C-alpha cells in the first residue's frame, strides 16, 4: 500500500509543481504586460482551489495511512491553504492585482520550492517502498 501511496504522491505533487510554474509564468507575464489583469485572474482563480484540494487530499491520505512525518511536512502549506480558503482570500482580484503582485509571486515561489523538495522526497520514499515490497516477495 505504501508504494502506491507514494506513486500517487509523486503524480499529484507533479501536478501541483507544474501548477506553481504556470502561476509564476503568469505573474511574470503580467509584470511584463503580456497579459491583462482580468485574464490573469480568470486563469489563476480557476486553478487555486483545485491545487489546494489536491494537496489537502494527499495530506489526508498520508494522515489516514499513518505516515505522520510526511503529514507533518505537509501541514504548514495545508494550514496556509486552509486559512486562505477559510478567510475567503484565496481568489485574486483584478482591481488589486498590481498592488499585491509581489506577495503572490513570493507565495508562488515558496510553494514552487516546497513542491520541488517534496517531489524528491516522495520519489525517494516511493523507491524505498518499492524496494521493500519487492524484498517481501523472496
Curated annotation (Swiss-Prot):
One Gene Ontology molecular-function label: signaling receptor binding
Ranges in the topological domain labelled Cytoplasmic: 2-6, 74-111
Membrane topology: Multi-pass membrane protein
Protein function: Could regulate export of the bud site and axial growth sites selection protein AXL2 and possibly other secretory proteins from the endoplasmic reticulum in COPII-coated vesicles. Seems to be required for axial budding pattern in haploid cells.
GO CC, any one term: endoplasmic reticulum membrane
Family indicated by similarity: Belongs to the cornichon family.
Protein name: ER-derived vesicles protein ERV14
Parts of the chain that traverse the membrane: 7-27, 53-73, 112-132
Membrane side Extracellular: residue ranges: 28-52, 133-138
InterPro entries named in the record: Cornichon, Cornichon_conserved
Disruption phenotype: Defects in cell polarity. Strains homozygous for ERV14 deletion do not sporulate.
PANTHER family: CORNICHON-RELATED
GO-annotated biological processes: ascospore formation; axial cellular bud site selection; endoplasmic reticulum to Golgi vesicle-mediated transport; negative regulation of receptor localization to synapse; regulation of AMPA receptor activity
Compartments reported by the entry: Endoplasmic reticulum membrane; Golgi apparatus membrane
UniProt keyword terms in alphabetical order: Endoplasmic reticulum, Golgi apparatus, Membrane, Transmembrane, Transmembrane helix
Organism of origin: Saccharomyces cerevisiae (strain ATCC 204508 / S288c) (Baker's yeast)
Domain of life: Eukaryota
Keyword DNA repair: no
Amino acid at each position: 500500500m505504501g508504494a502506491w501511496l507514494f506513486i500517487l504522491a509523486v503524480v499529484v505533487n507533479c501536478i501541483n509543481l507544474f501548477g506553481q510554474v504556470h502561476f509564476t509564468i503568469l505573474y511574470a507575464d503580467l509584470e511584463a504586460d503580456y497579459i491583462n489583469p482580468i485574464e490573469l485572474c480568470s486563469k489563476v482563480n480557476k486553478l487555486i482551489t483545485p491545487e489546494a484540494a489536491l494537496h489537502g487530499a494527499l495530506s489526508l491520505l498520508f494522515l489516514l495511512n499513518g505516515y505522520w512525518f510526511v503529514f507533518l511536512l505537509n501541514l504548514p502549506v495545508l494550514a496556509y491553504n486552509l486559512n486562505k480558503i477559510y478567510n475567503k482570500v484565496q481568489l485574486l482580484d483584478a482591481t488589486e492585482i498590481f498592488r499585491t503582485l509581489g506577495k503572490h509571486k513570493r507565495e508562488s515561489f515558496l510553494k514552487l520550492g516546497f513542491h520541488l523538495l517534496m517531489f524528491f522526497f516522495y520519489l525517494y520514499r516511493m523507491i524505498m517502498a518499492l524496494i521493500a515490497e519487492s524484498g517481501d516477495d523472496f
